[in-house]
Amino acid sequence: MVKQKRKGLERTAKESKKQKITPAEETPRASEARPGKEAASPVVQEASPELSPEERRVLERKLKKERKKEEKKRLREAGIATAQTAKVQTPPAKPSAAVLALEYLQGWAEKQESWRFQKTRQTWLLLHMYDEDKVPEQHFSTLLDYLEGLRGSARELTVQKAETLMQELDGTDPKARSLGKMQRLRQVLQLLS
C-alpha cells in the first residue's frame, strides 16, 4: 500500500510539472522581450510558487540559454564578432629571438643589475654568431667580450664548431667563401684557443 501511495504521488507531481511549464508558444521569445534577466523573470515568477527551487533553477537556465542563442544569432546577422572571438584574434606581438638575444648581450655589456644568465639567449647567440645579418658588426665585438668569459662545455663546443666550420670553408671554392664569416671564425678561434 505504501508503494501505491508513492506511485500516486509521483504521477501527480509529474502531471503538475507538465502543467506548470508553459508551452513554448505561450512563453515570450527573448528577441521580442526586453534583453537581460527581466525577459525570463515573469515566466519564472508566474510558475515560482508552484515550482521547487531546483525546477525554477533549471527553467531559468533554459531561458538564459535561449536568450544567449538569440543574441548570438542577432549579432551574427549584424556581422559583429563576439567579444570572445575578438580576444582570440589579436594576440600580443612577441619580440623575436634575435631581438631578445641582442638585448641580453647589451644588458651584459652594460652590467645592468637586472641582467642574469639565460641559457636560451646564450645558445641563440652561439648558434648565430657567424651570421652577419643576425648579429650585426656593432654587436659582434661585445659578443667576443662575452665569449671570453665562456666556461665549461659551452666553451669546448664553441671551439669544436668553429674548427669544423673553418675546415668546411677551407674545402669549399674560394669564390664561394664569405669573408665576413671567415674573419669571425678566426677571431673566435684566436680568442678561445
From Swiss-Prot:
List the GO cellular component terms. Answer: extracellular space
Q: Which portions of the sequence form the region Disordered? A: 1-77
- What's this chain's function? Hormone secreted from the intestine in response to cholesterol, where it acts to inhibit cholesterol synthesis in the liver and VLDL secretion,leading to a reduction in circulating cholesterol levels. Acts through binding to its receptor, GPR146.
Organism for this UniProt entry? Rattus norvegicus (Rat)
- Protein name (record): Cholesin
Q: Name one GO molecular function term.
A: hormone activity
Its main localization is: secreted
Q: Please provide the Gene Ontology terms (biological process) for this protein.
A: negative regulation of cholesterol biosynthetic process
Q: Which controlled-vocabulary keywords does the entry list?
A: Phosphoprotein, Secreted
- Entry annotated with the keyword Secreted: yes
Question: Which positions carry Phosphoserine?
Answer: 41, 48, 52, 96
Please state the gene responsible for encoding this protein. Chlsn
Q: Where is the composition biased (Basic and acidic residues)?
A: 7-18, 26-37, 53-77
Q: Where in the cell is it found?
A: Secreted
